[in-house]
Swiss-Prot record:
This is Peptide deformylase. The gene is def. The lineage of its organism: Bacteria, Pseudomonadati, Dictyoglomota, Dictyoglomia, Dictyoglomales. Binds 1 Fe(2+) ion. GO terms for biological process: co-translational protein modification; translation. It holds the Pfam family Pep_deformylase.
Amino acid sequence: MIMEIRKIGDPILKIKAKKVEKIDEKVKNLVRDMIETMKFSNGVGLAAPQVGESLRIIVVDYEENPIAFINPEILEMDGEVLDYEGCLSVPGVEVPIKRAERIIFKAQDLQGRTKRYKAKGLLARVIQHEVDHLEGILILDRAVEESTLAEEK
């Protein structure tokens, strides 16, 4: 089922999401709906708060294969890259954001197994973006000045 994507101004986007305690049918159905919604919206990632559920669940489109991560936690970050990001919850806006180039993170899969993952490049950026949603952080909160040099008038 395609879900409504919550937009900037919705209070659920600004609160810390709750840990998933049990991966049951309700969680699996939510993940299915999130993947369908992400694909329908041409997104590369989606976090549960974006569809109105305050749960620590993200889905990402990895090489055309959507993957769900339950209770993701970034353990290590390395390197720094500045690039523009958009967000389904902040339509029509792209802002420059510094992100780690490489990350190591852990998360549970849909069977409840905790695994460690390495990600780099775009995938690392998407995961950091979606984990931000779980912390109540939007791209406008992370945006950096486009230039640190300004001409004085």
